[in-house]
Amino acid sequence: MFAVRCARRAFPLVVLSLALLGSTCGSVASADMSSPSPGDPATQADLVRDLPDSSTIEQAIVDALTATSLPPQPARLAVPGDDRAGCTTDYLETSALGCVHGDPNGTRTVVLWGDSHVWMWLPAFDAIGRDAQTQIVEFSKSSCGPQDMRIWLERLRRAYKECDDFNRFVAGRIEAMRPDVVVLTGGVKGVRLVEGDHGTAQGVEDAWAAGMASTIRAVAPFAGQTIVLGDIAYPAPEPADCLSAHANDPHACDTPRSGAVDENGNPAGVFDDHNQREQQVAEQNGARYVSVTRWLCRDNVCPAVIGGLAVYRDYFHISPNYAYWLSNALGTATGLLR
């Protein structure tokens, strides 16, 4: 069905120690090839079903909040390598390959549409797709969420017209593909609207709500179901530097859920007002909304380490290992694992 597919890397068994996570926050430490290859669909299915469910993750957060030390043993998870090369659309590009993850021969098709948060969640969706015999088709573009709104890109110091063009391209692909499910996701932190020759944060929430509603309505006739995947909690300290500097303090790198500010002076934690409004917009327009903050925070705290894993890759993304660890819970919450 899909003529263009990017080359995919095999799934190694990745061994990640907390010491390494402190310095690289989610990169590969070493590979243990004595274990069965997670690239085999049957093996991957078993691995996903063995990962924690939502209640187990929530209990792990409770445990993290009361921890007196960081785990001394490395965490072992089968996670994908970095598949962004040739798949995630760069700033000046306006089309995408539509890379296929999950089960390339799957009988169902799920489209992921959004900014770098699409790539962030790929370890989970790839595993879900393999388990559920589902093709996961990626349409992602750097700093370009799926909502229909005109944004400013500070990197280019101008209106991000390439984002507008890219989103029109993806909408056309969805119309042609008629997928079973479309998942929309994007990070709101740092988003700015165009105001003359500069960007402004004023009015972002209204524009985001209207733009998300417009996108949902646009894809509804061509998708069996539309899911809006909610935003994450954003860390206040820089994850890698903080974990490296505070290896003996399990809570030095935690972030308050509300009222937090990162080291660059930007808001951090959970943007509850934004999430609540996005959920309302999604549900009012017939989409399913899936919140992810329950897997990141508890009692007004968002730990930096949960279940022995560094939660964050950087200021804007959770780590590949943590995303993969959420595969079972995310697959259940979205209804993609049955």
Question: Over which residues does each language-model region extend?
Answer:
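Extracellular/periplasmic envelope-modification machinery, especially enzymes
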Residues: F2-R338
